[in-house]
Design a protein with these regions (language model features):
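Intrinsic disorder at enzyme termini
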Residues: 1-21
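Low-complexity, intrinsically disordered short peptide segments enriched in small/polar/basic residues
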Residues: 8-12, 23-26, 49, 62
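Glycine-rich flavin
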Residues: 34-173
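A non-catalytic, amphipathic alpha-helix used as a structural packing/dimerization or gating element
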Residues: 18-32
């Protein structure tokens, strides 16, 4: 009975086998942030600044930023491996994923000047670009039903219409 109860509380996570060196490097960072760290952060309702900084210093949050902008230039699967390893270790990938992915908008839609100005700072952790507002009063976080729209007016202006309920990580973004 006791053995089956222990097994019921054990979580087995099977990770892919790609990017083994990356997995090991991420795991080494995660090992410095044991369960006690996360319990204290949770109890105090604090953002894990130290963890995010450690990921930044090791280049993981700039993984998808091209090398020409001081990032690692890794493929999307490598970023998934980073988050997969963070979460499997018991750390909180939610504190890191936005910094890794939001800059994709800048890569796709930013002009050359904006990329040169912002991407190196994001890659080095000098600029935090991780706030986002998805949740709306009538659609929740179902991004396929969002009603907020941005309409271009002229060459350099947009008019945004709609409502957002929360902006995640606004306090930890520049």
């Amino acid at each position: 009975m006791e053995g089956s109860r222990a097994a019921a509380h054990s979580v087995q996570v099977e990770l892919g086998s790609d990017f083994p060196e990356l997995r090991d490097a991420v795991q080494r960072v995660c090992d410095d942030f044991p369960g006690e760290y996360w319990r204290k952060k949770d109890e105090a309702q604090e953002y894990p600044k130290e963890f995010v900084q450690a990921l930044t210093e090791n280049g993981f949050l700039g993984a998808l930023i091209p090398e020409e902008y001081d990032g690692s230039g890794l493929p999307l699967r490598a970023a998934a491996v980073i988050l997969e390893t963070i979460n499997a270790s018991g750390c909180n990938g939610g504190a890191a994923h936005a910094q890794m992915y939001i800059m994709g908008t800048l890569l796709r839609h930013g002009n050359a000047e904006q990329k040169r100005k912002y991407l190196p700072g994001i890659a080095r952790g000098e600029l935090r670009l991780q706030a986002f507002g998805v949740t709306e009063p009538t659609t929740g976080s179902d991004t396929t039903k969002l009603k907020t729209r941005a309409e271009k007016k002229g060459n350099d202006r947009y008019v945004v219409t709609g409502q957002k309920v929360w902006t995640s990580r606004a306090l930890y973004s520049d």
